[in-house]
Structure formats: structure tokens, C-alpha cells
From Swiss-Prot:
Superkingdom in the source lineage: Bacteria
Pathway this chain belongs to: Amino-acid biosynthesis; L-isoleucine biosynthesis; L-isoleucine from 2-oxobutanoate: step 3/4; Amino-acid biosynthesis; L-valine biosynthesis; L-valine from pyruvate: step 3/4
Similarity comment text for this entry: Belongs to the IlvD/Edd family.
General function of this protein: Functions in the biosynthesis of branched-chain amino acids. Catalyzes the dehydration of (2R,3R)-2,3-dihydroxy-3-methylpentanoate (2,3-dihydroxy-3-methylvalerate) into 2-oxo-3-methylpentanoate (2-oxo-3-methylvalerate) and of (2R)-2,3-dihydroxy-3-methylbutanoate (2,3-dihydroxyisovalerate) into 2-oxo-3-methylbutanoate (2-oxoisovalerate), the penultimate precursor to L-isoleucine and L-valine, respectively.
EC number, as in UniProt: 4.2.1.9
Biological-process GO terms, alphabetical: isoleucine biosynthetic process; L-valine biosynthetic process
SUPFAM superfamilies: IlvD/EDD N-terminal domain-like (SSF143975), LeuD/IlvD-like (SSF52016)
Residues forming the catalytic site: 515 (proton acceptor)
Catalytic activity: (2R)-2,3-dihydroxy-3-methylbutanoate = 3-methyl-2-oxobutanoate + H2O; (2R,3R)-2,3-dihydroxy-3-methylpentanoate = (S)-3-methyl-2-oxopentanoate + H2O
Protein name: Dihydroxy-acid dehydratase
Length: 615
């Protein structure tokens, strides 16, 4: 039976000094016999998805203490991708994931904590904490801040979100008054942006991995029901500690819950709900922390057999996360996947002995439990606020229509092929990814002329200056993990292509990545990246490029001899942008770039290189 990790600093004569310091934090004699639960909060006033989290750590802490544990809260950083976007701030977004993972490891290991509650929400915070949890492999529960309500305005018949504001702002035909109205209406409350963007995608995937409570990904930040998730997280983590430290039950450890099959479940859900392509990057990174052999080839295999059962903004204007919740949330999607034979249901979770038990209890089409039905009727109030749990509005009915509703059955899927795909070819030997959920079927096969840009900034200038024409394939390179550095999101270029009326007439390929708000024929994560000698660095203006989603291929239409000749020429020049880029690459960013791998490896640190540098 394992000892509490915390005994290292709470027991024995030699730890008198440490105990003295623990006492200064409020601990008493009886507390040294209890598990110390680290509460990793990510409150910040910079990010709407985190602005309401200030008191959440203490809410969990009090419940931990009532359940018999000792709670100690600390904070991590949190970057808002939307605010950091469109300038050099975006260089810091993906590297912040590693900083978050490291900071959780540092705090938990330095103080010998026995377990963790991860209070996350937005784009890099949930992945960073997930990486840390799998690295540490001690009991953990994830609880997020919850999604934002969709925006409302008389100028639109559908709910609004951040992307709507960006697209309308770039539309030269839109009046200043209309732009201002969209801006004021798009993000009305606290919470992660209201569509199936990266933050909400990742919070949904923690449910599929078995590390979060049902409703974690879909219950609105503003709704009073969400408070119960925080309270239950406090009780659950103490129970997990009891099972592991007192009952010798290793099945509750995160690597045993989030095993290979659980990663398949998470990716299956991601494909079925048309999640952000960033989730692929983050799942690959988390799998490496868990020492699981899960890669793009596994994702490619799943993408060919999993149908799309849910469609949410930005892939469709009609639905946002509040509608997913009304339709039964993530466990109703998992239930449909299970009935289709597409899910591993024999796996443990933090709340149920098996995923099958969890589905039986929480899928609204399988349970008659009125409390569950009431929970999923929680809806938006339509009142701008930055306060959590501030409203108790409920829908009059659930959306249990599996033929035409927000969530569909396998038989009535939006499409029989899912919302994400992996493409391979001579331009991306190690793969690249596309969110097919946001691509019109008429352009699933697209051949066009390459239009080269060697930075996101120059691409934005070119698109706004009408240098990009119908039939072009915009290539934005040297924006990968090393080349950026930091693998910027390309939401502005894709949004501006839409605003120029080119959303269905152009494609975009990059070794950078995309916001979860991106739609259209936008292909990212090209691996190897240009800075690592990837063939995307060999494309020239006017080259023909063929994209074939049905056959999962993407190719530069030149022969092998020409490709080899170009590679030899580029080797002499060096793999760097031709044009000078006025961006300040600090020591912190250089350190990230030194060790960063390409996107097919999750853009994590190159551990083999690190082992050579520090044997």
C-alpha cells in the first residue's frame, strides 16, 4: 500500500522545520495524517474563461476539507488566444502550455502533494494541466470554468461568438454601427468561447478520457448547476485518494484511467463532434506524457470510421455549447457512439466504475432519472455577466431528437465520415490535419495554385490587399513550433478569406495551427515543418497543389527529381524565411524553439535531444 507522498515533508524528526512551515499555513496536528490535495487554479482577469475562477479554488478546498483532506491552492498562468492573436503575443500561446505543465509539476513535486484538482478552462490551460497530471500520475480530477453563453443581437438570427465579430469587422461592406453591435454582443458572459473551439473541445475530451465529471464540457459558466461540479470534484478527489493510498487501488491513477483505449475514446469523440484541430496536437502531447504509443496513424484510422454526430459553431451557426448541453452533453454523444460499437465502455472513470455505467446514468436517452434531465435543461439567461453561478434558467424541454437535433444517432449522422481528417503526401510526409466538419463537400477535392507567404502577418496583408484570388492555395510557412517560434494560430487569415468571399474558393495550408474557430479548407500542422526541413518549405509561387480529402492525400504536383533538386538548393540556403520578419524572439521563445518537435509529435520537447544535452 503506497504511503502518502506528503509524508516526505510531514513526518519524522528531520522534518520539524517543514512542519513548522506547514503549521504557518494553518495546518494542525491532525492534518498531518490526511492527504494533501493540490488545487491548481488558473484564475486571471486577462481571460473571460478564467475571470470567474477566483473563488473556485476555495470552493473546492472547503469541500476537500469536509471530506477529510487538506487543500492547498496555487495558480498557474493562462493566455487568452483571442486577445494574443494578430500580433506577436500569439508566439507565446503554445509555449505557455509547457510552462503550465511544468509549473504544476514544480508545485506538486516540490511540496509532495498527494493528489490534484485541476481548475482549468481555456485553450492551453486544460492541455497543460492534462500533461502535468499524466506526467505526475497521482489521483486527479479536472473541473473547468465552463462555456460562455452565445451572444444575441437583433442583427442576426443565430447566436454570435468571437469569430462572427472578427469576420464582420473585416467585411468592408459592413457599417461601423453593425461591427460595433457584433463586438458588444459576441462575448456576453464569463466562460470559454461559446462554440466548439479549442477550450470547449478539450474540456469535453477530459470527460471522454474519464478524468472529469459529466457536464464538465457543456454546463454553462453562468449557471448555478455548475457549482455542484466544483463541490463534487472536492469530494471525488478525496475518495480517489482513499482508494489509492488506503485500498491499494491503482486503477484510479490517471495513467490507468487515461490509457490507450481512453485516448481512442477521446479522439473518437473529437471526430464525432467536429472538435478543434488543436485537440489533436494536445492529445498527442498528453499521450507522450503518459508514455502511450498514440500517434497520427491511430487518429487517421479512427477518422475513417467515426461519423459526425454533433455539429456546433463554427461548423454550423445554429448550435453552440448551450445547445449541446440541452441535448444531453458529452455523455449523450458517448452513448450514441457506444450504441454504434465505436467506444470502449469497459474503462474506469473518476466518477463511475466503467464508462458503460457512466453512460447508463448520464445519457438522457437511457436514463429516467429526473435529476439528470433537470441538469441538462440548464440554459442561458441572456444577461451579460462576469459572475459564475449567477442564473438558474432552464429550457422547458430537452433536445432528445436524434434524427434532426443537435446530437444525432449513428444512423442519422451529419456525415458518415467524421469531422477531422489526417492527410499525407509529399508536401507533408509526417502528416497534416484538417477539420472536415467546417469544409464544404464541394471542395473536398481541390487543386489550386500556391500563393506563398512566409509569415502570418504577410498573409494577412496579402489577403486584405486582394493579392489572393479564387483558386489559390495560400501557403503560410515558417510558423511551426520551431519556425515561429510557437506555432501561431491562423484565425485572422481564414476569417479574412471568408470576409473576402473566398471561403469556398481558396484553401490554406500551414505548418502553423488554427483556432478552434476556424472553418473552411484550412489544413494545418504540416509536418515536418519548414524550419525542420519539411517539404512545405520547397513550394514555390504558382506550383500546383492537389488536396484530396476522401483519399486523405495532399501533394505538390512536381516529380521526385524536381523535389530533390529543390531540397539540395534549400539545404545550401538554410531553412529559414527569405523575407525578414520584424518579430522579437526573446530568450524564453528561443529556449522553446530549441527543443520543440513538429506538430505530428504534439509540438512537445524533443526528449531525445534533451537527453543528449543533459545526460
Amino acid at each position: 500500500m503506497p504511503d502518502y507522498r506528503s509524508k516526505t515533508s510531514t513526518h519524522g524528526r528531520n522534518m520539524a522545520g517543514a512542519r513548522a512551515l506547514w503549521r504557518a499555513t494553518g495546518m494542525k496536528d491532525e492534518d498531518f495524517k490526511k492527504p494533501i490535495i493540490a488545487i491548481a487554479n488558473s484564475f486571471t482577469q486577462f481571460v473571460p474563461g478564467h475571470v470567474h475562477l477566483k473563488d473556485m479554488g476555495q470552493l473546492v478546498a472547503r469541500e476537500v476539507e469536509r471530506a477529510g483532506g487538506v487543500a492547498k491552492e496555487f495558480n498557474t498562468i493562462a493566455v487568452d488566444d483571442g486577445i494574443a492573436m494578430g500580433h506577436d503575443g500569439m508566439l507565446y500561446s503554445l509555449p505557455s502550455r509547457e510552462i503550465i505543465a511544468d509549473s504544476v509539476e514544480y508545485m506538486v513535486n516540490a511540496h509532495c502533494a498527494d493528489a490534484i484538482v485541476c481548475i482549468s478552462n481555456c485553450d492551453k490551460i486544460t492541455p497543460g494541466m492534462l500533461m502535468a497530471a499524466l506526467r505526475l500520475n497521482i489521483p486527479v480530477v479536472f473541473v473547468s470554468g465552463g462555456p460562455m453563453e452565445a451572444g444575441k443581437t437583433k442583427l442576426a438570427s443565430h447566436g454570435l461568438d468571437l469569430v462572427d465579430a472578427m469576420v464582420i469587422a473585416a467585411d468592408s461592406t459592413a457599417s461601423d454601427e453593425k461591427v460595433a453591435e457584433y463586438e458588444r454582443s459576441a462575448c456576453p458572459t464569463c466562460g470559454s468561447c461559446s462554440g466548439m473551439f479549442t477550450a470547449n473541445s478539450m474540456n469535453c475530451l477530459t470527460e471522454a478520457l474519464g478524468l472529469a465529471l459529466p457536464g464538465n464540457g457543456s454546463a454553462l459558466a453562468t449557471h448555478s448547476d455548475r457549482e455542484q461540479l466544483f463541490l463534487q470534484a472536492g469530494r471525488t478527489i478525496v475518495d480517489l485518494c482513499r482508494q489509492y493510498y488506503k485500498e491499494n487501488d491503482y486503477s484510479v491513477l490517471p495513467r490507468n484511467i487515461a490509457n490507450f483505449k481512453a485516448f481512442e475514446n477521446a479522439m473518437t469523440l473529437d471526430i464525432a463532434m467536429g472538435g478543434s484541430t488543436n485537440t489533436i496536437l494536445h492529445l498527442l502531447a498528453a499521450a507522450q506524457e503518459a508514455e502511450i504509443d498514440f500517434d497520427l496513424h491511430h487518429i487517421d484510422r479512427l477518422s475513417r470510421k467515426v461519423p459526425q454526430l454533433c455539429k456546433v459553431a463554427p461548423n454550423i451557426q445554429k448550435y453552440h455549447m448551450e445547445d449541446v448541453h440541452r441535448a444531453g452533453g458529452i455523455f449523450s454523444i458517448l452513448g450514441e457512439l457506444a450504441r454504434g460499437g465505436l467506444l470502449h465502455t469497459d474503462l474506469p472513470t473518476v466518477h463511475s466504475k466503467t464508462m458503460a455505467e457512466g453512460i447508463a446514468k448520464w445519457d438522457i436517452t437511457q436514463t429516467d432519472d429526473e435529476a439528470v434531465h433537470t441538469f441538462f435543461k440548464a440554459g442561458p439567461a441572456g444577461i451579460p455577466t462576469q459572475t459564475a453561478f449567477s442564473q438558474s434558467t432552464r429550457w422547458e424541454s430537452l433536445d432528445d431528437d436524434r434524427e434532426n437535433g443537435c446530437i444525432r444517432s449513428v444512423e442519422h449522422a451529419y456525415s458518415q465520415e467524421g469531422g477531422l481528417a489526417v492527410l499525407y503526401g509529399n508536401i507533408a510526409l509526417d502528416g497534416c490535419v484538417v477539420k472536415t466538419a467546417g469544409v464544404d463537400e464541394s471542395i473536398h477535392v481541390f487543386e489550386g495554385n500556391a500563393k506563398i507567404f512566409e509569415s502570418q502577418d504577410s498573409a494577412v496583408r496579402g489577403i486584405l490587399a486582394d493579392e489572393v484570388k479564387a483558386g489559390d492555395i495560400v501557403i503560410i510557412r515558417y510558423e511551426g513550433p520551431k519556425g515561429g517560434p510557437g506555432m501561431q494560430e491562423m484565425l485572422y487569415p481564414t476569417s479574412y478569406l471568408k470576409s473576402k468571399g473566398l471561403g469556398k474558393d481558396c484553401a490554406l495550408l500551414t505548418d502553423g495551427r488554427f483556432s478552434g474557430g476556424t472553418s473552411g479548407l484550412s489544413i494545418g500542422h504540416a509536418s515536418p515543418e519548414a524550419a525542420a526541413g519539411g517539404a512545405i518549405g520547397l513550394v514555390r509561387d504558382g506550383d500546383k497543389v492537389l488536396i484530396d480529402i476522401p483519399n486523405r492525400s495532399i501533394n505538390l504536383m512536381i516529380d521526385d527529381a524536381e523535389m530533390a533538386e529543390r531540397r539540395a538548393e534549400q539545404d545550401k540556403k538554410g531553412w529559414k524565411p527569405v523575407e525578414s520578419r520584424p518579430r522579437k524572439v526573446t530568450t524564453a521563445l528561443k529556449a522553446y524553439a530549441l527543443l520543440a518537435t513538429s506538430a505530428d509529435k504534439g509540438a512537445v520537447r524533443d526528449k531525445a535531444l534533451l537527453d543528449k544535452l543533459v545526460p
